């Protein structure tokens, strides 16, 4: 979900930070990856090996803050694409927005959730 003015704000933020290669909209994730697992044969292991003792059992408030890129807006310098042959570069500037504006649409159910979120913030009226 992209509120009015977000594109202009993102371009402005990138222009104000000449050492940044790009800007990406992010938000706090609904699930912390420090509490996620991956399958390793018959067993599971933590997705991230952080060195934090039993990180999967720690309160999320004590874990490092992470952000989820939600695809709402990416602003990229042409020099990043041409010179670095990258869509993000090495220095990505965050633009943190409310997670209520995150919409990951993969199926009809997630589309309905996104439509409800749009209505709740006044989009489409």
Model-assigned labels for residue ranges:
Residues 2-90:
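Conserved core of the sugar-phosphate nucleotidyltransferase
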Residues 65-125:
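Conserved alpha/beta core of the MobA/IspD/sugar-nucleotide pyrophosphorylase nucleotidyltransferase superfamily
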């Amino acid at each position: 979900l992209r509120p009015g003015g977000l594109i202009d704000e993102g371009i402005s933020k990138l222009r104000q930070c000449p050492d940044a290669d790009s800007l990406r909209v992010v938000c706090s994730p609904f699930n912390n990856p420090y509490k996620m697992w991956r399958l390793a044969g018959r067993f599971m292991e933590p997705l991230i090996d952080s060195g934090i003792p039993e990180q999967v059992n720690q309160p999320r408030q004590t874990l490092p803050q992470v952000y989820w890129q939600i695809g709402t807006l990416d602003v990229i310098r042409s020099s990043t694409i041409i010179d670095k042959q990258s869509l993000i570069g090495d220095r990505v500037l965050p633009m943190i927005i409310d997670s209520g504006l995150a919409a990951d649409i993969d199926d009809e159910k997630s589309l309905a959730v996104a439509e409800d979120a749009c209505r709740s913030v006044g989009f489409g009226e």
